Amino acid sequence: MSHLRSVAAKLKPYCTGLLVKHNSILRTLPPRCYVYSSGAKEPFLSGTNSSYVEEMYYAWLENPKSVHKSWDAFFRSADNGTPQCEIQGVPSLADIESKLPSLSSQGLATAPAKAEKIVEEHLAVQSLIRAYQIRGHHVAQLDPLGILDADLDSFVPSDLITTLDKLGFYGLHEGDLDKVFRLPTTTYIGGTDSTLSLREIIRRLENSYCQHIGLEFMFINDVEQCQWIRQKFETPGIMKFINEEKRTLLARLIRSTRFEDFLARKWSSEKRFGLEGCEVMIPALKAIIDKSSEMGLEYVILGMPHRGRLNVLANVIRKDLDQIFCQFDPKLEASDEGSGDVKYHLGMYHERINRATNKKITLSLVANPSHLEAVDPVVQGKTKAEQFYRGDTEGNKVMSILVHGDAAFAGQGVVYETFHLSDLPSYTTNGTIHIVVNNQIGFTTDPRMARSSPYPTDVARVVNAPIFHVNADDPEAVMYVCSVAAEWRNTFNKDVVVDLVCYRRSGHNEMDEPMFTQPLMYKQIHKQVPVLKKYADKMIAEGTVTLQEFEEEIAKYDRICEEAYARSKDKKILNIKHWLDSPWPGFFTLDGEPKSMTCPPTGIPEDMLSHIGAIASSVPLKDFKIHGGLSRILKSRLEMTNSRTVDWALAEYMTFGSLLKEGIHVRLSGQDVERGTFSHRHHVLHDQEVDRWTCVPMNHLWPNQAPYTVCNSSLSEYGVLGFELGFAMASPNALVLWEAQFGDFYNTAQCIIDQFISSGQAKWVRHNGIVLLLPHGMEGMGPEHSSARPERFLQMSNDDSDAYPEFTQDFDVSQLFDCNWIVVNCSNPASYFHVLRRQILLPFRKPLIIFTPKSLLRHPEAKSSFDDMKTGTNFQRVIPENGAASHSPQEVKRVIFCTGKVYYELVKERHRKGLDSQVAITRLEQISPFPFDLVKQEAEKYATSELVWCQEEHKNMGYYDYVKARFLTILNHARPVWYVGRDPAAAPATGNKNTHHVELRRFLDIAFDLEYFEGKPF
């Protein structure tokens, strides 16, 4: 296009001169009505004429003989770079004048009128073609039921383009139907022909855009991509299938349909969320996988809701049918610990040979909850990880497919969040194929009440993804669209949406009565001939298959199902681990158990600490200009390293750096994590003079180290946390961390935490080692910048408050193995260092929730020595009192147990009041699972002392409800554990700074009032 503009620029002086001369002639004529565009001074360069020149140039590029010889000569000269003054082949003004008719009013009027007529007709045809390309989908025959227009737009007339009376809008009329027009280069309807009659143009456009396929793509701002789609759908005869392809399609439809029929016969009263009404989805998915495998793809990761899931497991993933049928037997108990999940939520991982390509293909269907679309970012994160570990930077080996329902695709915000990750460098999966099962109803809700946009797929427009709507009762159209979708993704590495417009033969589930709310729709559905019968009749009529062959194929699959059903009756137990969607080969034993129940020391050699500290204090790149304030930070780090101390940021640096040396990939993601919300991290340095020149010193630590990824995320919690969870699913040998900007904001991702992180292992036997960093602390910053809601995480912890555990030699590790997640609140950098390293050195994986500090990041007392981090040291679940009070425990009047930042306020207040020998302060670094053994030791050490739990959070929040019950279990309810902290409240914190300090002063006074609880009932 840029070259065309340069050619047009060379034409500009000639056109301008011609216009001036032409206008002077017109002044002698009788008055007429002329309408000029804003670009009248440049008739060939703007408005309609510029389009004409553009078409002429494109036509000349394709075939120089298709244009007049004068244009051929002109374009040849201009294309060769000939100076404008030397261009040959364009007549001079004098030549033009000599060829004009005599200056009679009739002659002067008819010549330009004839030329204008030719241009106008050409542009009219071009506009008509463009109208079909832009709006043809509005009148496509998409609804199998013939009830609704799929787009729901009542303002779009059904005869938008398709009737003859509409031709006048484009400047054409019925008399032009047999007139032959040259086709523009923006269409492929001509095939090998460059001209067609208007009647044939309309017929071919109707076939391409207004039948069972509706295309939305003209909003894409890329000419190459638009041309690619036009070529795929406009070229005559391009959608033809050979007989072998049709037979394969029919066989797949048989399997899809008969599987649902078999389940309906055997378990008529069971919920299974069948696929009836959209049976074509199974052949559709298989067509995508076949085409992608043909183009070199090795791994497909799928995410989908419950509808049709069992069918996908059986006929796409190829899960053994007997194992699927076992899930319907209520008498079978699971051999695995945990709750398990309903059959239509389960996932699966399978490696097999793709029969269509004879290539190995790996398929993974990710387990998910009933929370619709929640699995979308999880699938994308897992896909990104699998691409990362394979070095698949272009997405040629690993791909994701997401299946959606129409109501959820339009209604759930996480869909939008996930789409907006698609082109971000650290989150892109190089294109996802989205399949929308558009059954035109959401449970009982009419789509006209469920969305404000014409289509459920309109959200995909935000990333310029082409949208292919297709009538699901036309299997061949569906197969072709899916094949094109796979090619699009492979060619452009961008998302694409296939909207399967279908219906739901039953209610929301098999027990539901849909006639209550959709009587007319379901009257039509009851009359609807199933797609298998429709297509089989068509194939038999064509002679592609015989009736006998069709019936034999049905009998063959029915026999397979019956044999599998018989085998399922021999099963004695269920194995949930057979449904694992993300296995870690070699990490566990063959039985899925940890190879040991021990954890090695988490400390590292001092020379390694010093080396990492030196790199963290420097800029590895030459001539890299950093900010002056950052220079001071790096200088401070070097001073700490030389003095063998670390603050929070340096301890984190040493954690990550040591793991990278051991070959462990570290990925830190979240809002503003590169610098850190509190400007403490600075893992990405920015040159102050060269735009976008950055340096990540962490990637310059060691030769052959693992890569370090630190990436600022979009302003999303739900989508991004789901993505990082999926990334952590792919491998146990990576430390994947998500940091909230403030801990308060994590709850917009509550669904991921509740449905996946907290309960994922119990439901799906799926380990995950994701780390959540949640900045937390009451610092007078108001109710939305104070609390990460630790009470919520503790309430979901599964350790029993009333069960006194047996203390074995490996109690600390086995306790971690039995819990659903680990909750810690570190009070010093060394604890943070050790707990992160322990996360990788454990022989299993559990989610780790860390309440990280804000003010402690720069607190002069919140530092650790190399001695606390060097070889042989470990994470301390409990840090006991080690001051004066610990030397004479019998004289200690009160023991204050606490966690996190409040420790430093307590120590300061104790010293101010001179109570160092009378009050002991013990810190719980690990809250859950509760360190029963170490807390018991402390309670026994101070057997006669008063026990207090002190927290800065309000009484109905924080840790008190969790720890109180466990303290009483340890103490056998023989001693009280008093509460010191803020009073109960609805909001997490006050918005008034003065009130904050009054509350702090009050509970600190109570904490060290040794007579406060005397005579009070517990």
Swiss-Prot record:
GO terms for cellular component: mitochondrial matrix; mitochondrion; oxoglutarate dehydrogenase complex. Belongs to the alpha-ketoglutarate dehydrogenase family. One of its GO terms (biological process) is 2-oxoglutarate metabolic process. It comes from Xenopus laevis (African clawed frog). SMART domains: Transket_pyr. It catalyses: N(6)-[(R)-lipoyl]-L-lysyl-[protein] + 2-oxoglutarate + H(+) = N(6)-[(R)-S(8)-succinyldihydrolipoyl]-L-lysyl-[protein] + CO2. Thiamine diphosphate binds at R307, D406, N439, I441, Q671. Keywords: Calcium, Glycolysis, Magnesium, Metal-binding, Mitochondrion, Oxidoreductase, Thiamine pyrophosphate, Transit peptide. The OGDHC complex comprises multiple copies of three catalytic enzyme components, the 2-oxoglutarate dehydrogenase (OGDH/E1), the dihydrolipoamide dehydrogenase (DLST/E2) and the dihydrolipoamide dehydrogenase (DLD/E3). OGDHL/E1-like isoenzyme may replace OGDH in the OGDHC complex in the brain. 2-oxoglutarate dehydrogenase (E1-like) component of the 2-oxoglutarate dehydrogenase multienzyme complex (OGDHC) which mediates the decarboxylation of alpha-ketoglutarate in the tricarboxylic acid cycle. The OGDHC complex catalyzes the overall conversion of 2-oxoglutarate to succinyl-CoA and CO(2) while reducing NAD(+) to NADH. The OGDHC complex is mainly active in the mitochondrion. Involved in the inhibition of cell proliferation and in apoptosis. Mg(2+) binds at D406, N439, I441. PANTHER family: 2-OXOGLUTARATE DEHYDROGENASE, 2-OXOGLUTARATE DEHYDROGENASE-LIKE, MITOCHONDRIAL. This is 2-oxoglutarate dehydrogenase-like, mitochondrial. It is found in: Mitochondrion matrix. Its cofactor is thiamine diphosphate; Mg(2+).
